């Protein structure tokens, strides 16, 4: 493909002595990480990013307050994306949970900040009864350990060039599991899924890569599908409490015609997801052929 975009994908194992968690954790990790990161990187008692001389090199600004795209006027997609599990209901228990983290472009240089933020978020807790410790962080592609709870192994990091990913090998019929909520009307057909993957990819390429993402062609029929609609809530200091909806589910498709660009976008989509609200870990799916 005629674009370039580097992705580093991390897998964090978090141990909770106990937890009482809501169905949706995307806002918990994004908001909680921001709170501890701000305390760590900003020396101002009353931060004001628009007059700060260090803003161009500030991770907090890149993740939370930068409000203009490089190519556009709306808010940019963020270079670090937390992808927690989606439960679909409130859960309680103890044990390990897995958190995936997508890091785009050269923002992998902030790995120490990511680890620091996750560690102190664990001490503070996702809520009063849900504190955790980092068991380990590994490179999700190679499986090599990047952090063992004490030491960082930067040499074990690797990046994927998304512009060089090979087309996904699929059969004439495929099943897609929609794992985290996706803002979309149901039923979601396969061409639309590929379309919203491409839209998300374009936003990341424009901000943290280069080149143009080509068009694709796909004709497919939805054989069967089942969906569940979720009302999700997010609270922020700037915008207060917001509610929005997302769907999870499963669909089986019969493909009549598909080109390599579409198959490549499916491969990329399993890594970066599709649709809006990437920063909250929304829109991630898995293909089963």
Swiss-Prot record:
Domain of life of the source: Archaea
Protein name: Uncharacterized protein AF_1859
The species this protein was found in: Archaeoglobus fulgidus (strain ATCC 49558 / DSM 4304 / JCM 9628 / NBRC 100126 / VC-16)
């Amino acid at each position: 493909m005629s674009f370039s975009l580097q992705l580093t994908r991390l897998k964090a194992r978090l141990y909770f002595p106990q937890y009482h968690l809501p169905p949706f954790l995307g806002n918990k990790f994004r908001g909680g990480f921001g709170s501890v990161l701000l305390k760590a990187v900003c020396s101002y008692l009353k931060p004001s990013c628009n007059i700060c001389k260090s803003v161009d090199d500030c991770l907090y600004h890149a993740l939370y307050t930068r409000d203009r795209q490089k190519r556009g006027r709306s808010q940019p997609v963020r270079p670090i994306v937390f992808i927690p599990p989606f439960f679909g209901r409130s859960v309680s228990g103890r044990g390990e949970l897995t958190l995936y983290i997508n890091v785009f472009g050269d923002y992998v240089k902030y790995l120490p900040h990511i680890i620091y933020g996750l560690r102190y978020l664990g001490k503070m807790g996702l809520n009063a009864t849900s504190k955790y410790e980092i068991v380990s962080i590994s490179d999700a592609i190679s499986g090599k350990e990047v952090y063992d709870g004490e030491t960082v192994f930067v040499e074990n990091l690797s990046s994927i060039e998304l512009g060089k990913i090979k087309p996904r090998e699929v059969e004439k019929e495929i099943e897609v599991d929609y794992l985290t909520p996706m803002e979309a009307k149901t039923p979601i057909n396969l061409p639309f899924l590929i379309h919203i993957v491409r839209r998300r990819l374009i936003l990341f390429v424009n901000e943290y890569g280069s080149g143009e993402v080509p068009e694709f062609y796909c004709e497919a029929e939805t054989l069967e599908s089942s969906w569940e609609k979720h009302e999700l809530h997010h609270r922020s200091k700037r915008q207060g409490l917001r509610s929005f909806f997302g769907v999870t589910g499963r669909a089986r498709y019969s493909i009549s015609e598909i080109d390599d660009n579409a198959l490549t976008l499916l491969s990329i989509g399993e890594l970066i997801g599709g649709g809006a609200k990437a920063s909250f870990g929304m829109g991630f799916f898995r293909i089963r052929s």
